[in-house]
C-alpha cells in the first residue's frame, strides 16, 4: 500500500468514513469481489481468505496491484476477519495495536455502516448458531460498562507501561490541597509486620503533624555520622512518632525522610517511584502454580510440566535475594517468606510432588507448599490435566489458604498467580484476604486454537474452554496488575493481535457474548521480562567460572565424526566459526528453514559450519506428527544440499549447565546463535545466548524483536525471507574478517543490552515496585471497585461454577483396585527400575502382613509393571478385575504360580528364569481377563 493511502486513513477518525471512498476507486471490481465473498453463504473469513478471493476475482494483475496498493488494500491489511452473512460482509479491522473498528458492507449496493462490537459479534454468531444470535436475552459480558471510572492510556506505545502511568495518576491525585494527601497518610499508618507498626505510629495521624515531625527528625538524624546504625537513635525517633523501617543507617533514614517530605510538599511520579521502592510493604509472598508436576528434580517432560517450573524457581530466587537486600536496607531484621503453592499429587511418579513442604534450593526462606485436590470421596491421587482442573480449584483455594495462613502466621503481602488455574486461585484468595495480587498468564490458550471461542462447543468436551476463558476473564479483571514478558503478549504486533488483546471482544455462541472483556490500555499491564540464571549463563570470557568438566563431552558432541544416538553429521573444517541454533523441532521454530537457508547459500557454507540442537533423528522415536514431518524434511535437506562435513545435528539436550557451556564453546569459535522462528512469544534462548556473549540473530516476529536492538546488540532476521536473512548472516562474517573488533563489539553490545534490561534482578525490582505501588492504588480505589467486584462474584458463582459441573471428575483410582491384585503376584524382593516413585500398598492382605511384620519396607513399582497395570486394570473395569482375580478358582491357580515363582527366586534363580516367570504370570492374568470379558474364543486366540 502506498504511504499516501496510509496517511489519508490515519487522518480519518474511522475506517467507516473512508471505506466508501475506497470502494468507489474501482466499483466494478469491488462489486465482483464482495459478490464472491457472499457467494458461499454464511462463513467466517480470515484476511488470507479475502486476499485469495480478490486474486480470483481480479484477474488483471496490474489492476489488482493498483487496488491492493490503494486505500482498500490498506483497510484489507488491517482486517483480522470478516463475518459473512449474505448480503452483508462485516469486517473486524485493527488499524493499530489495541484499536478495533467494525464496519458492515452491503454486497449489493456497497453501502457501508459503522457497527458496534456487539453488532459484529451477533453477525459472527449467526454463522455458528443463528437462533442464539437472535436471542434478546443472550448473556452479554461487558466489563467496560462498570469500569469506566478507571483511567486509561491512549497510545499504543504506552501499552505495558502501567506502573509508570500509575505513578503519574497517583501524583496527580495527591497534588493540591493537603486533604488530598490523606490516602498516603492512611497507607503509611497501615504498614505493619505481625502487628508491629512500621514507619509511623498513630501519633502522626495528620498530614501536618507528619510534615512537622519529618523536618525535626531530619535535623536529629543529621547530627549522626552517615554510617551510624539506626538502633543508636531509634528511641529518639520513636518519641517523635516514628517506627523502624526508614533505613539501617543514619544516611539511609535521612534520605527516605527527605523523599517523603518532598512527596508531601509537591508529589511527582519520580519521587513517588523512589518512595514506594523504599517502603517496607512486602515481606511474605505467595506464588500459585497449580497444574502439572511442580518440583525441582525429575519433573520436566511430565504432563503439563515445562519451562514454567524453571521460570518460577528462578523468579523465587531473585525475589528472595532482592527482599533480603531491601529488608536489610530498611533496618529490619525480618525474614522474608516465599511460598510456591501447588498441587500435592500422591501418585508422584518418582518425584517429590507427594511431599507437602520442600525447601527451594538456592534460597534461605522459600518453600514449595503442596496441597492436595480433595473431592467428596477424599484426596484425589492421580494427575489431572490442566484442561480438567477446574472443579477442584475452589476447594483447593480454601485448603491452601488455611495452610498458608498457618505457615506464614499472617496474611501474605503479595499473591502472584501463574496460568489460568493459578491466576483464578490467586484471585479467589486475594479477594478473600484483601491482599494485592498480580497475575502471569505465560500462555493464553485462546490464541493457540483458531476460532476456539466461536467453536467452543466442538472443543469443550476435550479442552473445557468454556471454563478456561471464563476463568481467564475473571482473573484478568480481579487482579491489581498483570505481568507479561513482552509487548507482543499484550497487544501483538502491527499485523497480529496480542494474546490479551484477543479477549477484548469475542463470542461463545450459546454461552455468552463478551463485548468488553479486557482493555489492553488498562494501566494494570506491565512488561517485566525474565532473565537467565546468571550463575549458569555467563560470558565466555569469564574463564574461572566456566564449566570445564563438560569440555570433553562437548568436544565429542560437536566434532566426533561417528554418528550415534546423540549426534549425526560431522564438521570437516574445525577452524570455521559455528552457526548455532537450539529449539524444538516443529514448524514454528523453523529449524529446517535455517538448514535450508544455509544449504542454498554457497558463500555461507564456505565461511561457517552449521550446528543445530533439535528433536530426534529417528521418526519412530517421536509421537508428534509435526515433529515427524520435520525430521523427514531435515534428512531430505541434508541429502539435497550435500551438507555432510559442514552440518552437525545434535539431539535435544536438557542439561542447562552443559547447554550454557555449549553456548560459550560456540563463542570460542567466534560463531553466532540464530533463532529463526516464524513467531516467538518471548525467546529465552536468545537471552541465554546473549548472556554467554554469543552474537545473536533472531526473528523479527515476536519477543526477540524487542530484546535485540538491530545492528547494536544483535540482529533481526525475517523468517519469511530466507535470502535476506542468510545474506545478513553472511555479511556479518565477512565484516568480522575485515574488522577484527566487530565480533567483539556485537558480543559486548548484547551483554550491555542484557545487563540493562533482561536480568532477574531487574525483574525482581520491578515486581516488588508493582507490589507496593499497586497496593496503594488498590487502597485508593477501593470504593470505586465495589460494583466491579460484585459483577465478578456474580459471573463466578452463576456462570463459572455451573460450567465446572460439566467437567467430569474422574473416579479416584486407589491402590487396592489398581495395584493390589497384580502386586500380590510378585515376589517381595522387587527392585526399582523406573523413575523411583514409591507407592503405598494398602490391600487387606498387605495390611495383615504389615501388622505381623511392623515397618516392612514398601515396594517400588517398576515402570514396566506400571504399564501393565495401566493396560490391564483400567479404571472402568477395576471392580470386575478385582472380582476375577479374587475368585476362588483363579486365586488357587495364581497362588500356585506365585509359590513356584517364589521358590525359584529363593533358590537364586537366574535373571532369565525370573523374567520368564514374570512373563508367565502377566500372560496368565491377561488370559483370565480376556476370557471373562471377551469370551473363550477371544482368549484362545490370545
UniProtKB/Swiss-Prot annotation:
Full protein name: Sucrose synthase 6
Reaction(s) the record says it catalyses: an NDP-alpha-D-glucose + D-fructose = a ribonucleoside 5'-diphosphate + sucrose + H(+)
Gene Ontology molecular function, alphabetical: sucrose synthase activity
Reported function: Sucrose-cleaving enzyme that provides UDP-glucose and fructose for various metabolic pathways. Functions in callose synthesis at the site of phloem sieve elements.
Biased composition annotated in UniProt, kind: Basic and acidic residues: 838-862
GN (gene name): SUS6
pH dependence: Optimum pH is 6.0-7.0 for degradative reaction. Optimum pH is 7.0 for synthetic reaction. Optimum pH is 9.0-9.5 for synthetic reaction.
Species per Swiss-Prot/TrEMBL record: Arabidopsis thaliana (Mouse-ear cress)
Keywords recorded for this protein, A-Z: Cell wall, Glycosyltransferase, Secreted, Transferase
Record region (GT-B glycosyltransferase): 281-759
Amino acid at each position: 500500500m502506498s504511504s499516501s493511502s496510509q496517511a489519508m486513513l490515519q487522518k480519518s477518525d474511522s475506517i467507516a468514513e473512508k471505506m466508501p471512498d475506497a470502494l468507489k476507486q474501482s466499483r466494478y471490481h469491488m462489486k465482483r469481489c464482495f459478490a464472491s465473498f457472499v457467494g458461499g453463504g454464511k462463513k467466517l473469513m480470515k484476511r488470507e481468505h479475502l486476499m485469495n478471493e480478490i486474486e480470483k476475482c481480479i484477474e488483471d494483475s496490474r489492476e489488482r496491484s493498483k487496488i491492493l496498493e490503494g486505500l482498500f488494500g490498506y483497510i484489507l491489511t488491517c482486517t483480522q476477519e470478516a463475518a459473512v452473512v449474505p448480503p452483508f460482509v462485516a469486517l473486524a479491522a485493527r488499524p493499530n495495536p489495541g484499536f478495533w473498528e467494525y464496519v458492515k458492507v452491503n454486497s449489493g449496493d456497497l453501502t457501508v455502516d459503522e457497527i458496534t462490537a456487539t453488532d459484529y459479534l451477533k453477525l459472527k454468531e449467526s454463522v455458528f448458531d443463528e437462533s442464539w444470535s437472535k436471542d434478546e436475552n443472550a448473556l452479554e459480558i461487558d466489563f467496560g460498562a462498570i469500569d469506566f471510572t478507571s483511567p486509561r492510556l491512549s497510545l499504543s506505545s504506552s501499552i505495558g507501561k502501567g506502573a509508570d502511568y500509575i505513578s503519574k495518576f497517583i501524583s496527580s491525585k495527591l497534588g493540591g490541597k493537603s486533604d488530598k494527601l490523606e490516602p498516603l497518610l492512611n497507607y503509611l499508618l497501615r504498614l505493619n509486620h505481625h502487628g508491629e507498626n512500621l514507619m509511623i505510629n498513630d501519633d502522626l495521624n495528620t498530614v501536618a503533624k507528619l510534615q512537622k515531625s519529618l523536618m525535626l527528625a531530619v535535623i536529629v538524624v543529621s547530627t549522626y555520622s552517615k554510617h551510624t546504625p539506626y538502633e543508636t537513635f531509634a528511641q529518639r525517633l520513636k518519641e517523635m512518632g516514628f517506627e523502624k523501617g526508614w533505613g539501617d543507617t543514619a544516611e539511609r533514614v535521612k534520605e527516605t525522610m527527605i523523599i517523603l517530605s518532598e512527596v508531601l510538599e509537591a508529589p511527582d511520579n519520580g519521587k513517588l517511584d523512589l518512595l514506594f521502592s523504599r517502603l517496607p510493604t512486602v515481606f511474605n509472598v505467595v506464588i500459585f502454580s497449580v497444574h502439572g508436576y511442580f518440583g525441582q528434580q525429575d519433573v520436566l517432560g511430565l504432563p503439563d510440566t515445562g519451562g514454567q517450573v524453571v521460570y518460577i524457581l528462578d523468579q523465587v530466587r531473585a525475589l528472595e535475594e532482592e527482599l533480603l537486600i531491601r529488608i536489610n536496607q530498611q533496618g529490619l531484621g525480618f525474614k522474608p517468606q516465599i511460598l510456591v503453592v501447588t498441587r500435592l499429587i500422591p501418585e508422584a511418579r518418582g518425584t517429590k510432588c507427594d511431599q507437602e513442604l520442600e525447601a527451594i534450593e538456592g534460597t534461605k526462606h522459600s518453600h514449595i507448599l503442596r496441597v492436595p485436590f480433595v473431592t467428596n470421596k477424599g484426596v484425589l491421587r492421580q494427575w489431572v490435566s490442566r484442561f480438567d482442573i477446574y472443579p477442584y480449584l475452589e476447594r483447593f483455594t480454601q485448603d491452601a489458604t488455611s495452610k498458608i495462613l498457618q505457615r506464614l502466621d499472617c496474611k501474605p503481602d503479595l499473591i502472584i498467580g501463574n496460568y489460568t488455574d493459578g491466576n483464578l486461585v490467586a484471585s479467589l484468595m486475594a479477594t478473600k484476604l484483601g491482599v494485592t495480587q498480580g497475575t502471569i498468564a505465560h500462555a493464553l490458550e485462546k490464541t493457540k486454537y483458531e476460532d476456539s471461542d466461536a467453536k467452543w462447543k466442538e472443543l469443550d468436551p476435550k479442552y473445557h474452554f468454556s471454563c478456561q476463558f471464563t476463568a481467564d476473564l475473571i482473573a484478568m479483571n480481579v487482579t491489581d496488575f498483570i505481568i507479561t514478558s513482552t509487548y507482543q503478549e499484550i497487544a501483538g504486533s502491527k499485523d497480529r493481535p496480542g494474546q490479551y488483546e484477543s479477549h477484548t471482544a469475542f463470542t461463545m455462541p450459546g454461552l455468552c457474548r463478551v463485548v468488553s472483556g479486557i482493555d489492553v490500555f488498562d494501566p494494570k499491564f506491565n512488561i517485566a521480562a525474565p532473565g537467565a540464571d546468571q550463575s549458569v549463563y555467563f560470558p565466555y570470557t569469564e574463564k574461572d567460572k566456566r564449566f570445564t568438566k563438560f569440555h570433553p563431552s562437548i568436544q565429542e558432541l560437536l566434532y566426533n565424526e561417528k554418528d550415534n544416538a546423540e549426534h549425526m553429521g560431522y564438521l570437516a573444517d574445525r577452524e570455521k566459526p559455528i552457526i548455532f541454533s537450539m529449539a524444538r523441532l516443529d514448524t514454528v521454530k523453523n529449524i529446517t528453514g535455517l538448514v535450508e537457508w544455509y544449504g542454498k547459500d554457497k558463500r555461507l557454507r564456505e565461511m561457517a559450519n552449521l550446528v543445530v540442537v533439535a528433536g530426534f533423528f529417528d521418526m519412530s522415536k517421536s509421537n508428534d506428527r509435526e515433529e515427524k514431518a520435520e525430521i523427514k524434511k531435515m534428512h531430505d535437506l541434508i541429502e539435497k544440499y550435500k551438507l555432510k562435513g559442514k552440518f552437525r545435528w545434535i539431539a535435544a539436550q536438557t542439561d542447562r549447565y552443559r547447554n550454557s557451556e555449549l553456548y560459550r564453546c560456540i563463542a570460542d569459535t567466534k560463531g553466532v546463535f540464530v533463532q529463526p522462528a516464524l513467531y516467538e512469544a518471548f525467546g529465552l534462548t536468545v537471552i541465554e545466548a546473549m548472556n554467554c556473549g554469543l552474537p545473536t540473530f533472531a526473528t523479527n516476529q515476536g519477543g526477540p524483536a524487542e530484546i535485540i536492538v538491530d545492528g547494536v546488540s544483535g540482529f533481526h532476521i525475517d523468517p519469511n525471507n530466507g535470502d535476506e536473512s542468510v545474506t545478513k548472516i553472511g555479511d556479518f562474517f565477512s565484516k568480522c574478517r575485515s574488522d577484527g573488533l566487530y565480533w567483539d563489539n556485537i558480543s559486548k553490545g548484547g551483554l550491555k543490552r542484557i545487563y540493562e534490561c533482561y536480568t532477574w534482578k531487574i525483574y525482581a525490582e520491578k515486581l516488588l515496585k508493582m507490589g507496593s505501588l499497586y497496593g496503594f492504588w488498590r487502597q485508593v480505589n477501593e470504593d470505586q471497585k465495589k460494583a466491579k467486584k460484585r459483577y465478578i462474584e456474580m459471573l463466578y458463582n452463576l456462570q463459572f461454577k455451573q460450567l465446572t459441573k460439566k467437567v467430569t471428575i474422574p473416579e479416584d483410582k486407589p491402590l487396592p483396585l489398581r495395584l493390589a491384585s497384580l502386586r500380590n503376584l510378585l515376589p517381595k524382593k522387587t527392585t526399582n527400575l523406573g523413575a523411583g516413585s514409591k507407592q503405598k500398598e494398602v490391600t487387606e492382605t498387605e495390611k495383615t502382613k504389615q501388622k505381623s511384620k511392623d515397618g516392612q519396607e514398601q515396594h517400588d513399582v517398576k515402570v514396566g509393571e506400571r504399564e501393565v497395570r495401566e493396560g490391564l486394570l483400567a479404571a472402568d473395569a477395576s471392580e470386575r478385575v478385582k472380582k476375577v482375580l479374587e475368585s476362588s478358582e483363579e486365586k488357587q491357580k495364581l497362588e500356585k504360580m506365585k509359590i513356584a515363582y517364589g521358590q525359584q527366586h529363593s533358590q537364586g534363580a537366574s535373571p532369565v528364569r525370573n523374567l520368564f516367570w514374570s512373563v508367565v504370570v502377566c500372560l496368565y492374568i491377561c488370559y483370565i481377563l480376556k476370557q471373562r470379558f471377551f469370551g473363550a474364543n477371544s482368549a484362545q486366540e490370545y
